[in-house]
């Protein structure tokens, strides 16, 4: 009998709402169903790393996978990267903009590869991180709620995600040294004006307008230093979206970290709930009718929240971008509004909440598409 090929799925750091562990175990289950011998290896940097890695050295694996990995920076006492002592291609599944992972993606490994959630971000890594050998854009899968969902036909929109006060982030930008401060403020203006403009494209345009050039390695370093731009854009548009709904007297239920910092123009239409671990988020989505997505940091890609809604028969109301317009049918599988014309959000939300047959039709279409393409 032929021996099964081996795969290790790591979880080397906990990402928000304990999602790294959840993703690792979902991926492992999916690989096992395909006939692989799969191990899940969860640890953090406080663990005995010798005990974690020594048993793996010299062994052959079809795939080594991690999420926003810390392993790429780990070395033995003689300077040898631990991943170079394991025989197999390593893929780092990057779950936010690669600019946050400058050191990890620059690691001098024999077989470093990357998976991304956004096509423009994949192209960015191809150009600016030559040590990454193979790249792939692939959305995360989604999971159906364990208990199943009984829809509550309430007049509210559910949003699940994190928030920070954009003014506080902008203050951080204002305190930055030059030329970073000027670059970041101009980039913020550009991305507010054009929400589907990739940050790296905007930075190249900005440099050209200033008559300046940067070599590729310095360009990536500057991008890493300008991380507050991406953080600001996320929260600027999340605030704008919730403000728009509340102004239109459409109730919003906010579940996640940081929403106590949100100041509403009409608190009567805002409900805040404590965050839940990632695995329980599907239960809340399964009992909701309409799920809001605001993810301008993946403006040529797809946030997993979209597929979570589709998997749990919850109508997804998402900011549009070219990638989503290509892979999903607007008005049939999801509903797309424009961040540039935020009034389209409240118009669409009001239509969905007043037309339950349309909601059900979209939910059923979306669930069929999820089962066909977006399971783990």
What are these regions (language model features)?
Residues 1-87, 223-228, 232-236, 247, ...:
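N-terminal pre-catalytic "stem/leader" segment of glycosyltransferase-like enzymes
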Residues 3, 11-19, 23, 133-299, ...:
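Nucleotide-sugar donor-binding catalytic core of glycosyltransferases
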Residues 8-11, 15-18, 22-34, 39-43, ...:
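Catalytic binding pocket for nucleotide-activated donors in carbohydrate/polymer assembly enzymes
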Residues 10-14, 42-45, 62-70, 89, 93-96, 290, 315, ...:
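Structural motif
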Residues 61, 87, 109-112, 132, ...:
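Short, well-ordered alpha-helix to beta-strand connector turns
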Residues 82-97, 113-117, 140, 158:
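Active-site proximal beta-strand in glycosyltransferases
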Residues 84-85, 102-117, 127-130:
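A conserved, positively charged/aromatic
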